A protein has these predicted regions:
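N-terminal hydrophobic targeting signals that begin at the initiator methionine
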Residues: 1-2, 18
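Sec-dependent N-terminal signal peptides
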Residues: 3-14
Length: 158
């Protein structure tokens, strides 16, 4: 009787597999399922058990992405993802005294800095001697450089 139960459990666990296809733009992204690398996108015909799973996507030049998926008991699940590109954004100040703050999280005082930012809108605040100098939304949609300097009127000017 024990052998029959074990065999029945094995058959049920094998039968409860779902075929997973993972499509990613851009192609060639590394696909990691529950901490295990399962290939480069597109991944076709990978067997998974129903339940919750974590998919992580990685590719140079793109922001890594993690997604939680709930796999239902079905024959096939096709998961489509689009990764967000990264852009090189440079910030430069022509004089000392500037403090930069990005998204309320990252702060620096360097006169030159190069950041890789995920595509999209980012809030940039610039302070000069601890006074707000500039507050704007920077859209990362290409590689670009921002140069900051204070306006100083010439002596004797009106």
């Amino acid at each position: 009787m024990k052998q029959i139960l074990i065999l029945q459990f094995f058959v049920v666990s094998v039968m409860a597999q779902v075929t997973l296809d993972v499509k990613v733009l851009p192609k060639g992204a590394t696909v990691i399922l529950d901490g295990k690398e399962i290939g480069s996108a597109p991944v076709k015909g990978y067997s998974v058990k129903p339940g919750g799973h974590e998919i992580r996507l990685e590719k140079n030049g793109y922001a890594p992405a993690t997604h939680e998926i709930a796999v239902q008991d079905a024959k096939r699940l096709v998961a489509d993802f689009i990764m967000n590109p990264m852009y090189t954004i440079k910030f430069r100040s022509k004089e000392k005294g500037f403090t930069f703050e990005l998204n309320g999280e990252h702060t620096w005082r360097d006169e030159k800095i190069k950041l890789n930012l995920e595509a999209g809108a980012h809030r940039l605040r610039v302070y000069y001697l601890d006074e707000l100098f500039d507050d704007q939304v920077v859209v990362a949609d290409r590689n670009v450089e921002f140069i900051y300097t204070r306006y100083q009127p010439e002596p004797g000017g009106n």
